[in-house]
Amino acid sequence: LPMFTIYKGEEGGAEPAGSVSISIEAGSVGLGTILPSTSVDFYQGEQLSSVVLRLLQNSGLDWRNDGDATGGFYLKAIGRGGITAGAAIPDDLMAHLEAVNCQMSGHDANWLGEFDFTMDSGWLYFVNGEYMNVGMSAYFPADGDEIRIRFSLYSGADVGAGTNGETWGDW
């Protein structure tokens, strides 16, 4: 398992600095919400990557990542038995992918992550509706943040965050 830091208050020790709401969504492949918005406490100085890893672990989800929770963290894949069962790219999104000659790829039944379905896919995250173009280990949550972790098939263009300037919609 990858290493990450868990910040935990002890008797009379540190109290949570606040809480955030985190959801995990895969509408781009027709799976909707994988994990509904869940309130998670965080501690002073804790990076979002540690908060997300704690949520994944407590929710029974597996993960693969690059880097670690304190630096260079990238969420590569989220896993659970049959996580991609019933996945289907919506027809209107498929039309956009075909129009740009997006290179399609296969996927694993138990994992959803980078290079699944397309060679431009991966997990992106948003804080309070804004796409964050920095790794989760570079973001320190604020009390009340609403965080959406979303699966994109084309560098964010399909989830309202086209990293190359293209935004097709919001699946």
Tell what function each PLM region has.
Residues 1-171:
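Ubiquitin-like/PB1-type beta-grasp interaction modules and other compact soluble beta-rich domains
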